Amino acid sequence: MRKLIIPLFVLLLPLSSEASVARRASLPDLVKASSTVVVGTVTQRSSFWSGTRIYTRNQITVEEIWLQGTTVDPQKLTLPPTSPALEVHTLGGVVGDIGQSVSGSPRLVTGHTYVLFLTEGAPNQWHVVALSQGAFEASSEALRPLTQTHALELVGDATAIPTTRTKLRQAIIAWVKEQP
């Protein structure tokens, strides 16, 4: 028996290094950590070096803004006219023939539409909140969390996050309106 367990452990050891572990974020966690929540399509991607890390710059054409600060009123949610698109930086990418992959970081795809929970870094430079937990692929009405495909192991209580665009938006609005 012992002879069988040791080889199995050795075989499984490399698999454990392929994932990031993070505390599971609830919808209130995502909303509280976000400066804005948008629905947008990736129109362009390019990777670049910053120190010893590679980042990917994702140009997002915003279709809808669901949250801006603490505002959920659709008539008050606007992007500045000088920047109709957002620049979202994600960890990892390929520059020349060198690539870096960061487990748990969202990998956005050109032409795909996402619901993104974002926080602003430098002016007009945004980052997805809570690794890939803050990104949902949106095909028409259905949402798919990117945590399912981006090697992110979540720990903590599972909280139900709505799986459609309409229900997620309604849940965000309801939560924000409940706050003092």
Q: Where are the language model's segments positioned?
A:
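Bacterial N-terminal signal peptides
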Residues: 6-14
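Sec/Tat signal peptide C-region and signal peptidase I cleavage site
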Residues: 15-19
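Short boundary/loop segments of OB/S1/cold-shock single-stranded nucleic-acid-binding domains
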Residues: 20-34, 49
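Short, conserved beta-turn/loop elements at beta-strand boundaries and strand-helix junctions
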Residues: 44-51, 67-68
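Short aromatic-glycine-enriched beta-strand elements
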Residues: 48-61
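Netrin-like (NTR/C345C) domain of secreted extracellular proteins
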Residues: 72, 97-180
